[in-house]
A protein has these predicted regions:
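Contiguous, well-folded functional domains in the mature portion of proteins
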Residues: 1-235
Length: 235
């Protein structure tokens, strides 16, 4: 759109593939054809892999909460950590804490990530690094490649989504340029495949989920914003 607004996308059928899923699916399709020509049983196995990839790379049908006070999950997966951490913010030096919610996406989850709030992209940049495992999250946060995406509401509240690379998540994708406005639940990007997503929100938000819970991107309410007048930024 000319004003930089991206409307929430609603899939018209089950197998609509996310834009960032097509490169993977195209390669899988080509491999399926080649293996079928070479040896039919291998082609049958590859076809099964193709169907599986189609499932996890699709645009899912999700019902996004309407309340403006709700922050939704940015990714499908299991919540592995909810922790208050020290943060700095050049726009508000008084902010010293943020709530960090860590979500681990598996190879059986939908890979498409979605905007947790309605707001404008104010930061989107990649930080080069390694692609180590997630067994030691402290090391992974320090050493692994990551992409940081900050969304800021009209009232100044901001949240940050961090895509964390890993052994299988080697492509961290978010094609939204700075200044683009996203609605809550709008496709945000993808960590191909099965990465970790960390969401940083104001420390005075109220979590609506627990460690171990499985969440759905764009649908599960994972936190509630503080009352107007007490809101703080977490970017």
């Amino acid at each position: 759109m000319g004003d930089g607004t991206v409307d929430q996308q609603k899939p018209s059928f089950f197998w609509q593939i996310a834009d960032d899923g097509w490169p993977v699916l195209a390669l899988a399709g080509l491999l399926t054809i080649l293996l079928t020509i070479m040896f039919v049983p291998l082609g049958t196995f590859a076809l099964g892999m193709f169907v599986w990839l189609s499932h996890i790379l699709r645009v899912p049908s999700r019902t996004t909460p309407q309340s403006a006070a709700v922050i939704v999950a940015p990714a499908d997966g299991r919540v592995t950590e909810i922790t208050k951490v020290a943060r700095t913010n050049e726009f508000d030096p008084q902010v010293t804490e943020a709530l960090r919610i860590t979500i681990r996406t598996s190879l059986s989850d939908v890979q498409l990530q979605m905007a947790p709030i309605e707001g404008r992209v104010t930061d989107n940049f990649a930080i080069p690094g390694l692609f180590g495992g997630y067994e030691d999250m402290t090391a992974a946060r320090a050493d692994n490649e990551r992409r940081e995406i900050t969304l800021t509401q009209d009232d100044g509240l901001s949240v940050m989504v961090v895509q964390l690379g890993g052994k299988t998540a080697r492509q961290l994708v978010c094609r939204h340029h700075v200044g683009r406005f996203l609605r809550r639940g709008t496709p945000l990007g993808m960590a191909r495949l099965a990465g970790v997503v960390e969401l940083f929100i104001p420390a005075d938000c109220t979590p609506q989920i627990a460690v171990g819970q499985h969440v759905l991107a764009g649908e599960t309410a994972i936190a509630r914003l503080p009352s107007r007048g007490r809101r703080r930024s977490s970017g």
